[in-house]
Amino acid sequence: MKRLCIIPCGKKKIWDVQPDAGPVRAEDAYLSPFHQACERYAKTFFDEWVILSAKHGFLRPDDLVSGNYDVTFGTGHPEIMTADELRRQFHEKGFSDIEELVMLGGKKYRSVLNAVIGEHQHISWPLSSYKGIGYMLQALNRAVEEKHEL
């Protein structure tokens, strides 16, 4: 069965440390420790993974991100992609055919993804039982180190 891992983007980006970096691949754009741990996990256990950005939607690792931004789901920011835009992009990128989705993120992503996925799709949230980002980071790092999927 084909699976897709969805990881959150993160606030700290390459342009925060290299303002003149210009456009970069999505997998190189996000620098927060949590995003980095999620990316390592996704690369370890999944053939296909994407980054979910409130501004850009579903980014494949090779998709280009043009520059810095600060847009977060649930904030009412005018640049947040709508559910319709996310649904269209999800379908156009071929993700609506994937039955098993895994989201490495917290509660704020539930309503976003529930509005996007199809009825035939199952989404799991392996970090939902961890209370706080520190525990999530520990779990992700331990899983990669021990080669044991959450």
Swiss-Prot record:
Highest taxon listed in the record's lineage: Bacteria
InterPro entries, per the entry: DUF6884
Protein name: Uncharacterized protein YfjM
Lineage: Bacteria, Bacillati, Bacillota, Bacilli, Bacillales
